[in-house]
Amino acid sequence: MTALRNPAPTDLTPTPTVTARILVTGGAGFIGSHFVRRLLAADDVDQITVLDALTYAGHRENLGEALTDPKLEFVQGSILNAHLVDELVQQHTAVVHFAAESHVDRSFFEAGAFLRTNVLGTYTLLDAVRRFGTSRFVHVSTDEVYGPLAFGCADESAPLRPTVPYAASKAASDMVALSYHCTYGVPVCVTRSSNNYGPAQHPEKIIPLFVTRLLKGEPVTLHGRGEHVRNWLHVEDNCQGIDLVLRGGTPGEVYNIGGGTDLTSAQLTGMLLELFGAGWDRVQHIPDRTCNDLRYAMDWSKIANQLGYRPTWDLTGGLAATVDWYRRNPDRWAPHVRAGDARPMHHPV
């Protein structure tokens, strides 16, 4: 088990920006809903509006009791609806943009939907901000835009080399966002996080997929020999990083957000099996999918040194808490499994 280098300590405190009225796109999704709850707990946030299309991966239930908070307004709608976006942007002082198609396997089958939502949808938001103005536009992205690395860690200046339609659509949206800062002065910041996990993640993703299968007594499937390396980041730590960028990030800058541990998929599988007291007889090895990048790795010292970011979750405790959530909340994930939303998907050859 290897870990990214630990950033040096810093006494820097982020400089707050005006964050009184915040529009959160994709706020009923996995990461977005966790971020909304974080904002609701902040004393300096007066109003939050969630704009979410409620696709298969977004659900009002993800927001839970937050929906009853008088500071929160929920709007069902698409970021591709320019009229709606214009109306909402005018009412807010900052935008945090989570809304995206995000499942790699689905992008093999539905690349057009990924390009429309992730690129054209981001443009629609940015152009509204260009015309009406906000104090900050935080564009939430992914480490997958850097593509695979044989060695070393990608910092924010590394070239973008996406290999699959999902990552390519996010890389394109990153570039559109940064171009709006350079060309029009839109106060854009971009965050790029490593693989997120935590409570209420849709069961199409690897950790909840494996957890829900183990809970049902079904085998889990491991691509190839399980050698693919990913950095794992608890969703609450990602939200901490995004919040720091919202409040203190420098417009025009990119901030990597990582966790403390790199694991191969086989190592991750072993940790989950141990939590269930299960053996490797529960694992089926299947052929690897196309363009399954062997290794992602980021250097996230910039956000640590400049904004004081520190992950608070260790992977062992985070996985245990995540498994416990899925044990206690079968009503939140079982319907999606029955509907086929979490079915394995592979690139058609």
Q: Model-flagged regions — what are they?
A:
Residues 66, 152, 203-211:
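A glycine/serine/threonine-rich, flexible loop-to-helix segment
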Residues 106, 205, 252:
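A short, glycine- and acidic-residue-rich donor-binding loop in the catalytic cores
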Residues 2-7, 14, 42, 58, ...:
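C-terminal substrate-binding subdomain of Rossmann-fold SDR/epimerase-dehydratase oxidoreductases
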Residues 2-196, 265, 294, 313, ...:
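N-terminal Rossmann-like NAD(P)+-binding domain of SDR-like oxidoreductases, especially those catalyzing
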Residues 35, 149-150, 201, 206, ...:
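Acidic donor-diphosphate engagement hotspot in glycosyltransferases and nucleotidyltransferases
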Residues 55, 202, 206, 264:
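Short acidic-hydrophobic sequence patches enriched in Asp/Glu that either
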Residues 162-169, 199, 203-207, 231-235:
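The catalytic Tyr-centered alpha-helix of NAD(P)H-dependent dehydrogenases
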